[in-house]
A protein has these predicted regions:
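Surface-exposed patches in mature extracellular/periplasmic domains of secreted proteins
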Residues: 56-64, 107-110, 128-135
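Alpha-helical scaffolding within the catalytic cores
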Residues: 59-66, 83, 88-93, 158-162
Length: 216
């Protein structure tokens, strides 16, 4: 799919939220990090969102390599892991073009990814800094209200959960969730033995993210 057509499809999806069927994807990257972490997370978020906020997303997410032109087939990419991330120059250019053409990337640090992914984000957008999203950002006030911003799902340490973004011409093109482990909260209940309340909070915040992406 060429970039102009991709942008057109994104605009159609936004205009007909809940009417078109579309697919989102997990981003596969190099460097040794476990891009495949949390295998039940995205399917559970998709089911929750389809049932509760009116999305019409295909039940199973795709998997797409960061350097592939196939990323232009998906309006939303999800990236996670615990370790190293390395993007070569062609992958960096491909991801940059995707985001500039209307795509969206959500990166969730699964604890241990932070120093690596920040370096790679800077390679994609050397001229733009990650900015912390304030608690009054619309992404926290969609279908579900999070007046204190990004919820803390797993407490590995005492650091607060934070949401960072890359904003271009007023559009949030990349969301980086840090010290939250929100993706763990999307997983099947028995994976981490999270309480129903914690899982619901994670899924509701995830639904807000999808709602924001497809309606803004």
């Amino acid at each position: 799919m060429n970039r102009l057509l991709f942008l057109f499809v994104c605009l159609i999806s936004i205009a007909s939220f809940g009417q078109n069927t579309y697919q989102i994807a997990i981003l596969k990257y190099n460097g040794g990090g476990d891009w495949y972490a949390n295998p039940t997370a995205l399917p559970n978020l998709i089911s929750f969102s389809n049932e509760n906020i009116g999305t019409n997303i295909k039940k199973e997410p795709a998997t797409v390599e960061v350097g592939s032109s196939d990323i232009f087939n998906y309006p939303f990419l999800h990236m996670t892991g615990h370790g190293n991330v390395v993007l070569n120059s062609s992958e960096t250019e491909n991801l940059r073009n995707y985001l500039l053409a209307g795509g969206f990337l959500h990166i969730d640090d699964n604890y241990g990814m932070d120093p690596y992914v920040r370096t790679e984000i800077k390679k994609v957008f050397p001229e733009i800094d990650l900015v912390e999203l304030p608690t009054n950002h619309p992404i926290f006030h969609g279908k579900y209200e999070f007046k204190n911003g990004l919820p803390k799902i797993h407490k590995h340490d005492a650091s607060p959960s934070q949401a960072f973004g890359i904003v271009i011409d007023g559009r949030l093109v990349l969301l980086y969730t840090y010290e939250s482990d929100i993706g763990d909260g999307w997983e099947d209940a028995e994976v981490h033995n999270d309480s129903e309340q914690i899982r619901l909070k994670a899924l509701q915040m995830g639904a807000n993210i999808l709602e924001y992406v497809f309606t803004n």
